[in-house]
Amino acid sequence: MKLWELLNGIPVASCAVDLEMEITGVSYDSRATQPGDLFVAMTGYATDGHKYIATALEKGAAAVLCQNLPEGEGPYIRTADSRRALAVIGANWFGHPAEEMTMIAVTGTCGKTTTTYLLKAILEQARGAKVGLIGTNQNMIGQEVIPTDRTTPESFEVQRLFREMADAGCAYAVMETSSHALCLDRVYGVYYAVGIFTNLTQDHLDFHVTMENYCDAKAILFRNCGVGVVNGDDPWTPRLLKDATCQVRTYGVKSEADLRAENVVLSANGIAFDAVTKTERVPIRVNIPGGFMVYNTLDVLGAALALGISLKDSAAVLAKVPHVQGRVEVVPTPGKDYTILIDYAHTPDSMVNVLQTVKEFAKGRTVAVFGCGGDRDKTKRPRMGKAAADWSDFAVVTTDNPRTEEPAAIIRDILPGFDDSNTPYEVVEDRVEAIRWAMDHAQKDDVIVLCGKGHETYQEVNHQKFHMDEREIVAEHLNSGR
Protein backbone atom coordinates (compact mmCIF):
# COMPACT_ATOMS: atom_id res chain seq x y z
CA MET A 1 0.00 0.00 0.00
CA LYS A 2 1.24 3.50 -0.81
CA LEU A 3 2.20 5.58 2.21
CA TRP A 4 -0.26 8.33 1.26
CA GLU A 5 -3.10 5.78 1.24
CA LEU A 6 -2.11 4.58 4.68
CA LEU A 7 -2.00 8.12 6.06
CA ASN A 8 -5.36 9.14 4.60
CA GLY A 9 -7.39 10.89 7.30
CA ILE A 10 -4.40 11.63 9.55
CA PRO A 11 -3.33 15.25 10.15
CA VAL A 12 0.39 15.34 9.29
CA ALA A 13 2.46 18.15 10.82
CA SER A 14 5.67 17.33 8.96
CA CYS A 15 6.87 14.61 6.59
CA ALA A 16 10.40 13.74 5.47
CA VAL A 17 9.35 10.72 3.41
CA ASP A 18 8.15 10.19 -0.16
CA LEU A 19 4.38 9.67 0.12
CA GLU A 20 4.49 7.40 -2.96
CA MET A 21 6.65 4.95 -1.02
CA GLU A 22 5.31 1.39 -0.90
CA ILE A 23 4.69 0.18 2.66
CA THR A 24 4.64 -3.59 3.17
CA GLY A 25 3.53 -3.77 6.80
CA VAL A 26 2.64 -1.85 9.94
CA SER A 27 4.18 -2.30 13.39
CA TYR A 28 3.91 -0.52 16.72
CA ASP A 29 6.20 -2.90 18.63
CA SER A 30 9.84 -2.61 17.54
CA ARG A 31 10.39 -6.28 18.39
CA ALA A 32 7.95 -7.25 15.64
CA THR A 33 9.12 -4.72 13.04
CA GLN A 34 9.92 -6.09 9.57
CA PRO A 35 11.75 -4.50 6.61
CA GLY A 36 9.40 -2.16 4.72
CA ASP A 37 7.14 -1.48 7.72
CA LEU A 38 5.69 1.80 8.83
CA PHE A 39 6.60 1.92 12.52
CA VAL A 40 4.15 3.85 14.71
CA ALA A 41 5.73 5.22 17.89
CA MET A 42 3.11 5.70 20.61
CA THR A 43 3.30 7.02 24.14
CA GLY A 44 1.84 4.17 26.16
CA TYR A 45 0.58 3.63 29.71
CA ALA A 46 3.68 1.63 30.70
CA THR A 47 6.31 2.64 28.14
CA ASP A 48 7.03 5.10 25.32
CA GLY A 49 7.39 3.75 21.79
CA HIS A 50 9.56 6.74 20.85
CA LYS A 51 12.40 5.07 22.79
CA TYR A 52 12.45 2.27 20.22
CA ILE A 53 12.51 4.27 16.98
CA ALA A 54 16.22 3.54 16.45
CA THR A 55 15.61 -0.18 16.97
CA ALA A 56 12.75 -0.17 14.46
CA LEU A 57 14.93 1.58 11.86
CA GLU A 58 17.76 -0.90 12.46
CA LYS A 59 15.27 -3.69 11.73
CA GLY A 60 14.35 -2.12 8.39
CA ALA A 61 11.38 0.15 9.04
CA ALA A 62 10.82 2.25 5.91
CA ALA A 63 9.23 5.15 7.78
CA VAL A 64 8.32 6.20 11.31
CA LEU A 65 5.14 7.96 12.40
CA CYS A 66 5.63 9.76 15.71
CA GLN A 67 4.46 12.60 17.93
CA ASN A 68 7.91 13.74 19.00
CA LEU A 69 10.61 14.01 16.34
CA PRO A 70 13.95 12.40 17.23
CA GLU A 71 17.12 14.43 16.88
CA GLY A 72 18.72 14.40 13.45
CA GLU A 73 17.34 13.49 10.06
CA GLY A 74 15.36 10.38 9.30
CA PRO A 75 12.26 9.01 7.55
CA TYR A 76 9.99 10.67 10.06
CA ILE A 77 6.35 11.71 9.84
CA ARG A 78 5.04 13.79 12.72
CA THR A 79 1.43 13.90 13.84
CA ALA A 80 -0.26 15.30 16.94
CA ASP A 81 -1.59 11.96 18.21
CA SER A 82 0.12 8.78 17.04
CA ARG A 83 -2.14 6.52 19.11
CA ARG A 84 -5.21 7.88 17.36
CA ALA A 85 -3.32 7.73 14.06
CA LEU A 86 -2.69 3.99 14.55
CA ALA A 87 -6.46 3.42 14.69
CA VAL A 88 -6.91 5.27 11.38
CA ILE A 89 -3.96 3.42 9.83
CA GLY A 90 -5.47 0.09 10.90
CA ALA A 91 -8.78 0.92 9.25
CA ASN A 92 -7.00 2.06 6.06
CA TRP A 93 -4.70 -0.98 5.95
CA PHE A 94 -7.53 -3.48 6.35
CA GLY A 95 -10.00 -1.66 4.09
CA HIS A 96 -12.44 -0.29 6.69
CA PRO A 97 -13.97 -3.68 7.61
CA ALA A 98 -16.22 -2.24 10.35
CA GLU A 99 -18.24 -0.54 7.62
CA GLU A 100 -19.14 -3.99 6.24
CA MET A 101 -20.83 -5.15 9.47
CA THR A 102 -23.38 -3.90 12.00
CA MET A 103 -21.31 -2.93 15.03
CA ILE A 104 -22.46 -3.24 18.66
CA ALA A 105 -20.37 -2.19 21.68
CA VAL A 106 -20.90 -2.96 25.36
CA THR A 107 -19.26 -0.87 28.08
CA GLY A 108 -19.60 -0.79 31.87
CA THR A 109 -17.86 -2.20 34.93
CA CYS A 110 -19.77 -5.47 35.27
CA GLY A 111 -21.88 -7.58 32.94
CA LYS A 112 -20.09 -6.92 29.64
CA THR A 113 -19.15 -10.54 28.92
CA THR A 114 -22.57 -11.98 29.73
CA THR A 115 -24.26 -9.25 27.68
CA THR A 116 -22.12 -9.92 24.60
CA TYR A 117 -22.70 -13.68 24.77
CA LEU A 118 -26.47 -13.34 25.17
CA LEU A 119 -26.71 -10.81 22.35
CA LYS A 120 -24.56 -12.98 20.09
CA ALA A 121 -26.93 -15.91 20.73
CA ILE A 122 -29.99 -13.80 19.87
CA LEU A 123 -28.46 -12.48 16.64
CA GLU A 124 -27.43 -15.97 15.58
CA GLN A 125 -30.68 -17.72 16.43
CA ALA A 126 -33.30 -15.02 15.85
CA ARG A 127 -31.62 -13.53 12.78
CA GLY A 128 -29.74 -16.56 11.48
CA ALA A 129 -26.66 -14.36 11.20
CA LYS A 130 -22.97 -15.08 11.61
CA VAL A 131 -21.62 -12.98 14.46
CA GLY A 132 -18.14 -11.95 15.53
CA LEU A 133 -17.34 -11.32 19.19
CA ILE A 134 -14.48 -9.51 20.93
CA GLY A 135 -14.40 -10.02 24.67
CA THR A 136 -12.68 -10.74 27.94
CA ASN A 137 -13.11 -14.51 27.74
CA GLN A 138 -12.20 -14.94 24.10
CA ASN A 139 -12.70 -13.60 20.61
CA MET A 140 -14.98 -15.51 18.25
CA ILE A 141 -15.74 -15.58 14.55
CA GLY A 142 -19.00 -17.46 14.41
CA GLN A 143 -18.21 -20.56 16.49
CA GLU A 144 -14.44 -20.38 15.95
CA VAL A 145 -12.63 -19.38 19.14
CA ILE A 146 -9.61 -17.07 19.09
CA PRO A 147 -7.77 -16.72 22.44
CA THR A 148 -7.33 -13.24 23.93
CA ASP A 149 -5.52 -11.67 26.89
CA ARG A 150 -7.23 -8.28 27.16
CA THR A 151 -10.81 -7.02 26.92
CA THR A 152 -10.16 -4.80 23.89
CA PRO A 153 -6.98 -5.39 21.82
CA GLU A 154 -4.80 -2.59 20.41
CA SER A 155 -6.48 -0.66 17.58
CA PHE A 156 -4.52 -2.29 14.74
CA GLU A 157 -5.41 -5.76 16.06
CA VAL A 158 -9.04 -4.70 16.44
CA GLN A 159 -9.11 -3.79 12.75
CA ARG A 160 -7.39 -7.08 11.86
CA LEU A 161 -10.11 -8.96 13.74
CA PHE A 162 -12.82 -6.93 12.01
CA ARG A 163 -11.32 -7.85 8.62
CA GLU A 164 -11.24 -11.55 9.53
CA MET A 165 -14.85 -11.34 10.70
CA ALA A 166 -16.06 -9.54 7.59
CA ASP A 167 -14.17 -11.91 5.28
CA ALA A 168 -15.71 -14.88 7.12
CA GLY A 169 -19.20 -13.53 6.42
CA CYS A 170 -20.06 -11.98 9.78
CA ALA A 171 -23.01 -9.62 9.51
CA TYR A 172 -22.57 -8.36 13.09
CA ALA A 173 -19.67 -7.71 15.45
CA VAL A 174 -20.40 -7.53 19.17
CA MET A 175 -17.59 -6.31 21.37
CA GLU A 176 -16.76 -5.52 24.96
CA THR A 177 -15.36 -2.01 24.93
CA SER A 178 -13.37 -1.19 28.04
CA SER A 179 -12.76 2.28 29.44
CA HIS A 180 -9.07 1.79 28.63
CA ALA A 181 -9.95 1.08 24.99
CA LEU A 182 -12.11 4.19 24.72
CA CYS A 183 -9.62 6.41 26.53
CA LEU A 184 -6.61 5.04 24.60
CA ASP A 185 -8.35 5.29 21.20
CA ARG A 186 -8.25 1.55 20.50
CA VAL A 187 -11.67 1.86 18.84
CA TYR A 188 -11.23 5.40 17.52
CA GLY A 189 -13.09 5.94 14.25
CA VAL A 190 -15.42 2.96 14.73
CA TYR A 191 -19.10 3.90 14.56
CA TYR A 192 -21.52 1.58 16.36
CA ALA A 193 -25.15 0.99 15.46
CA VAL A 194 -25.81 0.30 19.16
CA GLY A 195 -23.86 1.14 22.30
CA ILE A 196 -24.81 -0.53 25.59
CA PHE A 197 -24.04 0.74 29.10
CA THR A 198 -24.33 -1.85 31.89
CA ASN A 199 -23.31 -0.01 35.09
CA LEU A 200 -20.46 1.88 36.73
CA THR A 201 -18.84 0.85 40.01
CA GLN A 202 -15.32 1.24 41.38
CA ASP A 203 -12.60 -0.32 39.23
CA HIS A 204 -9.51 0.78 37.27
CA LEU A 205 -8.90 3.84 39.45
CA ASP A 206 -5.19 3.07 39.18
CA PHE A 207 -5.64 4.29 35.58
CA HIS A 208 -8.52 6.79 35.73
CA VAL A 209 -7.80 8.12 39.27
CA THR A 210 -11.40 9.32 39.84
CA MET A 211 -14.84 7.86 39.21
CA GLU A 212 -15.67 10.98 37.20
CA ASN A 213 -12.79 10.29 34.81
CA TYR A 214 -13.84 6.64 34.63
CA CYS A 215 -17.40 7.65 33.70
CA ASP A 216 -16.19 10.20 31.14
CA ALA A 217 -14.11 7.50 29.42
CA LYS A 218 -17.21 5.30 29.10
CA ALA A 219 -19.17 8.28 27.77
CA ILE A 220 -17.00 8.44 24.64
CA LEU A 221 -18.99 5.51 23.24
CA PHE A 222 -22.23 7.48 23.28
CA ARG A 223 -20.78 10.12 21.00
CA ASN A 224 -19.95 7.39 18.48
CA CYS A 225 -23.09 5.28 18.20
CA GLY A 226 -26.57 5.51 16.70
CA VAL A 227 -28.61 4.20 19.63
CA GLY A 228 -27.50 4.12 23.27
CA VAL A 229 -29.14 1.44 25.42
CA VAL A 230 -28.39 2.55 28.98
CA ASN A 231 -29.14 1.54 32.56
CA GLY A 232 -31.71 4.01 33.83
CA ASP A 233 -31.19 2.83 37.42
CA ASP A 234 -27.47 3.62 37.50
CA PRO A 235 -26.62 6.92 39.25
CA TRP A 236 -23.83 7.63 36.75
CA THR A 237 -26.10 7.54 33.71
CA PRO A 238 -26.93 11.31 33.67
CA ARG A 239 -23.22 12.19 33.58
CA LEU A 240 -22.59 9.48 31.00
CA LEU A 241 -25.19 11.01 28.67
CA LYS A 242 -24.27 14.66 29.27
CA ASP A 243 -22.65 15.06 25.84
CA ALA A 244 -24.21 12.06 24.10
CA THR A 245 -25.17 12.48 20.45
CA CYS A 246 -27.07 9.20 20.07
CA GLN A 247 -30.72 8.30 20.42
CA VAL A 248 -31.16 7.06 24.02
CA ARG A 249 -33.24 4.10 25.19
CA THR A 250 -33.29 3.28 28.90
CA TYR A 251 -33.87 0.04 30.77
CA GLY A 252 -34.32 -0.62 34.47
CA VAL A 253 -36.19 -2.10 37.38
CA LYS A 254 -36.62 0.92 39.64
CA SER A 255 -36.80 3.76 37.13
CA GLU A 256 -39.51 4.73 34.66
CA ALA A 257 -37.47 3.30 31.83
CA ASP A 258 -38.39 2.62 28.20
CA LEU A 259 -37.92 -1.09 28.95
CA ARG A 260 -38.70 -2.36 32.45
CA ALA A 261 -38.58 -5.61 34.37
CA GLU A 262 -41.66 -6.33 36.48
CA ASN A 263 -42.72 -9.33 38.58
CA VAL A 264 -39.10 -10.44 39.02
CA VAL A 265 -38.62 -13.98 40.36
CA LEU A 266 -35.15 -15.20 41.40
CA SER A 267 -34.26 -18.84 41.99
CA ALA A 268 -31.26 -21.15 42.10
CA ASN A 269 -32.05 -22.17 38.52
CA GLY A 270 -32.31 -18.72 36.98
CA ILE A 271 -34.44 -15.61 36.70
CA ALA A 272 -37.90 -14.79 35.37
CA PHE A 273 -39.65 -11.47 34.84
CA ASP A 274 -42.02 -9.60 32.57
CA ALA A 275 -40.32 -7.32 30.05
CA VAL A 276 -42.58 -4.29 29.74
CA THR A 277 -42.62 -1.46 27.19
CA LYS A 278 -45.32 1.09 26.40
CA THR A 279 -46.93 -1.36 23.98
CA GLU A 280 -46.29 -4.90 25.22
CA ARG A 281 -45.54 -7.24 28.11
CA VAL A 282 -43.50 -10.39 27.39
CA PRO A 283 -42.49 -13.09 29.91
CA ILE A 284 -38.72 -13.68 30.02
CA ARG A 285 -36.84 -16.67 31.43
CA VAL A 286 -33.04 -17.09 31.63
CA ASN A 287 -31.37 -20.13 33.16
CA ILE A 288 -28.61 -18.14 34.88
CA PRO A 289 -29.20 -17.17 38.53
CA GLY A 290 -28.69 -13.78 40.17
CA GLY A 291 -30.46 -10.48 40.54
CA PHE A 292 -27.76 -8.81 38.42
CA MET A 293 -28.86 -11.06 35.54
CA VAL A 294 -32.09 -9.07 35.33
CA TYR A 295 -30.06 -6.05 34.21
CA ASN A 296 -27.84 -8.11 31.90
CA THR A 297 -30.96 -9.49 30.27
CA LEU A 298 -32.69 -6.11 29.99
CA ASP A 299 -29.76 -4.50 28.21
CA VAL A 300 -29.66 -7.37 25.72
CA LEU A 301 -33.41 -7.11 25.09
CA GLY A 302 -33.07 -3.35 24.61
CA ALA A 303 -30.22 -3.75 22.13
CA ALA A 304 -32.10 -6.44 20.23
CA LEU A 305 -35.14 -4.15 20.00
CA ALA A 306 -32.91 -1.38 18.64
CA LEU A 307 -31.74 -3.84 15.98
CA GLY A 308 -35.32 -4.75 15.04
CA ILE A 309 -35.65 -8.05 16.92
CA SER A 310 -38.89 -8.45 18.86
CA LEU A 311 -39.07 -9.22 22.57
CA LYS A 312 -40.83 -12.50 21.80
CA ASP A 313 -38.09 -13.65 19.44
CA SER A 314 -35.41 -12.69 21.95
CA ALA A 315 -37.30 -14.43 24.77
CA ALA A 316 -37.38 -17.69 22.81
CA VAL A 317 -33.59 -17.64 22.48
CA LEU A 318 -32.86 -16.58 26.06
CA ALA A 319 -34.95 -19.42 27.47
CA LYS A 320 -32.47 -21.90 25.96
CA VAL A 321 -29.16 -20.08 26.38
CA PRO A 322 -26.49 -21.91 28.45
CA HIS A 323 -24.23 -20.53 31.17
CA VAL A 324 -21.33 -18.26 30.28
CA GLN A 325 -17.92 -19.66 31.24
CA GLY A 326 -16.59 -18.20 34.48
CA ARG A 327 -19.84 -16.49 35.40
CA VAL A 328 -21.62 -18.30 38.28
CA GLU A 329 -20.17 -21.48 36.74
CA VAL A 330 -20.78 -24.73 38.63
CA VAL A 331 -17.70 -26.94 38.98
CA PRO A 332 -18.45 -30.69 39.15
CA THR A 333 -17.90 -32.16 42.65
CA PRO A 334 -19.17 -35.75 42.28
CA GLY A 335 -19.81 -37.53 45.55
CA LYS A 336 -19.51 -34.37 47.66
CA ASP A 337 -22.27 -32.65 49.62
CA TYR A 338 -21.03 -29.15 48.86
CA THR A 339 -21.07 -26.99 45.72
CA ILE A 340 -18.26 -25.02 44.08
CA LEU A 341 -18.87 -22.02 41.83
CA ILE A 342 -16.36 -20.04 39.77
CA ASP A 343 -17.06 -16.38 39.06
CA TYR A 344 -15.04 -13.53 37.56
CA ALA A 345 -16.15 -11.18 40.37
CA HIS A 346 -13.10 -8.98 40.92
CA THR A 347 -14.62 -5.68 42.04
CA PRO A 348 -16.45 -4.91 45.30
CA ASP A 349 -19.83 -4.60 43.58
CA SER A 350 -19.45 -7.73 41.46
CA MET A 351 -18.49 -9.67 44.61
CA VAL A 352 -21.58 -8.40 46.39
CA ASN A 353 -23.69 -9.38 43.37
CA VAL A 354 -22.43 -12.94 43.15
CA LEU A 355 -22.45 -13.55 46.92
CA GLN A 356 -25.99 -12.14 47.17
CA THR A 357 -27.00 -14.49 44.38
CA VAL A 358 -25.56 -17.48 46.23
CA LYS A 359 -27.25 -16.40 49.47
CA GLU A 360 -30.58 -16.57 47.64
CA PHE A 361 -30.32 -20.33 47.16
CA ALA A 362 -27.57 -21.70 49.44
CA LYS A 363 -28.84 -24.12 52.08
CA GLY A 364 -25.54 -24.04 53.97
CA ARG A 365 -22.76 -21.50 54.34
CA THR A 366 -21.59 -19.19 51.60
CA VAL A 367 -17.79 -19.41 51.52
CA ALA A 368 -15.86 -16.78 49.54
CA VAL A 369 -12.34 -17.54 48.28
CA PHE A 370 -10.85 -14.35 46.88
CA GLY A 371 -7.89 -12.00 46.52
CA CYS A 372 -7.10 -8.76 44.70
CA GLY A 373 -4.94 -8.09 41.66
CA GLY A 374 -1.52 -6.55 42.10
CA ASP A 375 -0.44 -3.32 40.39
CA ARG A 376 -4.06 -2.20 40.26
CA ASP A 377 -6.37 0.10 42.22
CA LYS A 378 -5.39 -0.38 45.88
CA THR A 379 -8.37 1.53 47.25
CA LYS A 380 -10.76 -1.26 46.32
CA ARG A 381 -8.90 -3.89 48.37
CA PRO A 382 -10.51 -3.18 51.77
CA ARG A 383 -13.85 -2.80 49.98
CA MET A 384 -13.39 -6.31 48.56
CA GLY A 385 -12.73 -7.49 52.10
CA LYS A 386 -15.88 -5.75 53.31
CA ALA A 387 -17.92 -7.32 50.49
CA ALA A 388 -16.78 -10.76 51.65
CA ALA A 389 -17.33 -9.86 55.30
CA ASP A 390 -20.86 -8.61 54.65
CA TRP A 391 -22.06 -11.29 52.25
CA SER A 392 -20.26 -14.53 53.08
CA ASP A 393 -20.43 -16.75 56.14
CA PHE A 394 -16.73 -17.60 55.89
CA ALA A 395 -13.93 -16.18 53.76
CA VAL A 396 -10.59 -17.51 52.58
CA VAL A 397 -8.34 -14.58 51.69
CA THR A 398 -5.68 -15.44 49.13
CA THR A 399 -3.96 -14.15 45.99
CA ASP A 400 -5.40 -13.28 42.59
CA ASN A 401 -2.88 -12.06 40.00
CA PRO A 402 -0.19 -10.53 42.25
CA ARG A 403 1.83 -9.34 39.25
CA THR A 404 4.85 -7.48 40.66
CA GLU A 405 3.49 -6.96 44.19
CA GLU A 406 4.11 -9.15 47.22
CA PRO A 407 0.98 -11.28 47.83
CA ALA A 408 1.26 -10.73 51.59
CA ALA A 409 1.17 -6.95 51.09
CA ILE A 410 -1.99 -7.20 48.98
CA ILE A 411 -3.64 -9.37 51.62
CA ARG A 412 -2.72 -6.84 54.32
CA ASP A 413 -4.60 -4.22 52.28
CA ILE A 414 -7.68 -6.46 52.10
CA LEU A 415 -7.99 -7.40 55.77
CA PRO A 416 -9.16 -4.01 57.15
CA GLY A 417 -12.44 -4.75 55.36
CA PHE A 418 -13.13 -7.35 58.06
CA ASP A 419 -12.49 -4.98 60.98
CA ASP A 420 -16.12 -4.25 61.84
CA SER A 421 -17.38 -7.75 61.08
CA ASN A 422 -17.79 -11.02 62.94
CA THR A 423 -17.37 -13.02 59.74
CA PRO A 424 -14.56 -15.55 60.31
CA TYR A 425 -11.79 -15.81 57.74
CA GLU A 426 -8.60 -17.71 57.00
CA VAL A 427 -5.56 -16.36 55.17
CA VAL A 428 -3.98 -18.87 52.77
CA GLU A 429 -1.57 -16.98 50.55
CA ASP A 430 -1.12 -19.62 47.82
CA ARG A 431 -4.33 -19.68 45.75
CA VAL A 432 -4.11 -23.39 44.91
CA GLU A 433 -3.71 -24.21 48.60
CA ALA A 434 -6.55 -21.83 49.45
CA ILE A 435 -8.93 -23.73 47.17
CA ARG A 436 -7.81 -27.04 48.66
CA TRP A 437 -8.22 -25.63 52.18
CA ALA A 438 -11.77 -24.50 51.44
CA MET A 439 -12.63 -27.93 50.05
CA ASP A 440 -11.06 -29.75 53.01
CA HIS A 441 -13.00 -27.63 55.50
CA ALA A 442 -16.31 -27.59 53.63
CA GLN A 443 -19.47 -28.46 55.54
CA LYS A 444 -22.65 -30.07 54.27
CA ASP A 445 -24.55 -27.83 51.81
CA ASP A 446 -21.80 -25.21 51.68
CA VAL A 447 -21.44 -23.19 48.49
CA ILE A 448 -17.79 -22.28 47.89
CA VAL A 449 -17.43 -19.32 45.54
CA LEU A 450 -14.03 -18.94 43.86
CA CYS A 451 -14.04 -15.22 43.06
CA GLY A 452 -11.83 -13.31 40.67
CA LYS A 453 -10.40 -15.67 38.07
CA GLY A 454 -13.54 -16.72 36.21
CA HIS A 455 -12.59 -17.73 32.67
CA GLU A 456 -8.87 -17.14 33.26
CA THR A 457 -6.65 -20.21 33.22
CA TYR A 458 -3.47 -18.56 34.44
CA GLN A 459 -1.95 -16.63 37.31
CA GLU A 460 0.23 -13.61 36.55
CA VAL A 461 3.34 -13.28 38.71
CA ASN A 462 6.29 -10.96 37.99
CA HIS A 463 5.37 -10.39 34.33
CA GLN A 464 4.90 -14.12 33.68
CA LYS A 465 1.68 -16.07 33.26
CA PHE A 466 1.63 -19.52 34.83
CA HIS A 467 -1.05 -22.07 33.98
CA MET A 468 -3.68 -22.28 36.70
CA ASP A 469 -7.17 -23.54 35.90
CA GLU A 470 -9.40 -23.64 38.97
CA ARG A 471 -11.51 -26.38 37.43
CA GLU A 472 -8.42 -28.58 37.19
CA ILE A 473 -7.38 -27.73 40.76
CA VAL A 474 -10.77 -28.84 42.07
CA ALA A 475 -10.78 -32.03 39.99
CA GLU A 476 -7.22 -32.95 40.98
CA HIS A 477 -7.95 -32.43 44.68
CA LEU A 478 -11.07 -34.56 44.44
CA ASN A 479 -9.14 -37.28 42.62
CA SER A 480 -6.48 -37.25 45.34
CA GLY A 481 -9.10 -38.68 47.69
CA ARG A 482 -9.13 -35.65 49.99
Residue ranges and their predicted role:
Residues E71-G72, G111, Q138-I141, A181-C183, ...:
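Short, active-site-adjacent cap segments at secondary-structure transitions
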Residues M1-S14, P35-L38, R84, E124, ...:
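ATP-dependent carboxylate-amine ligase
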Residues G49-L65, Y76-A85, A193-N199, D216-K218, ...:
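A short, gly/pro- and small-residue-rich
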